[in-house]
Amino acid sequence: MTTNTQYIYPIFTVRWLAVHALAVPTVFFLGSISAMQFIQR
């Protein structure tokens, strides 16, 4: 279990970081755009 965790840990961390690095700014971008449109109206 220890060897498996050490082998899988970095791969999952990189993938988790990549997914969140793309998903978080996208949600923030969409939210800010919709907020700006609501405020301007």
Swiss-Prot record:
Annotated GO MF terms: electron transfer activity; heme binding; iron ion binding
Pfam family of the protein (one): Cytochrom_B559
S-S pairs: none
Topology in membrane: Single-pass membrane protein
GO biological process entries: photosynthetic electron transport chain
Residues reported to bind heme: 20
Keywords, in A-Z order: Chloroplast, Electron transport, Heme, Iron, Membrane, Metal-binding, Photosynthesis, Photosystem II, Plastid, Thylakoid, Transmembrane, Transmembrane helix, Transport
Gene Ontology CC terms: chloroplast thylakoid membrane; photosystem II reaction center
Subcellular locations according to the entry: Plastid, Chloroplast thylakoid membrane
Ranges that cross the membrane: 16-32
Cofactor(s) needed by this chain: heme b
InterPro entries named in the record: PSII_cyt_b559_bsu, PSII_cyt_b559_CS, PSII_cyt_b559_N
Cofactor binding annotation: With its partner (PsbE) binds heme. PSII binds additional chlorophylls, carotenoids and specific lipids.
Domain of life: Eukaryota
Free-text function comment from the UniProt entry: This b-type cytochrome is tightly associated with the reaction center of photosystem II (PSII). PSII is a light-driven water:plastoquinone oxidoreductase that uses light energy to abstract electrons from H(2)O, generating O(2) and a proton gradient subsequently used for ATP formation. It consists of a core antenna complex that captures photons, and an electron transfer chain that converts photonic excitation into a charge separation.
Subunit composition and interactions: Heterodimer of an alpha subunit and a beta subunit. PSII is composed of 1 copy each of membrane proteins PsbA, PsbB, PsbC, PsbD, PsbE, PsbF, PsbH, PsbI, PsbJ, PsbK, PsbL, PsbM, PsbT, PsbX, PsbY, PsbZ, Psb30/Ycf12, at least 3 peripheral proteins of the oxygen-evolving complex and a large number of cofactors. It forms dimeric complexes.
HAMAP family in the cross-refs: PSII_PsbF
Family to which this protein belongs: Belongs to the PsbE/PsbF family.
Protein name, per record: Cytochrome b559 subunit beta
Lineage start: Eukaryota, Viridiplantae, Chlorophyta, Nephroselmidophyceae, Nephroselmidales
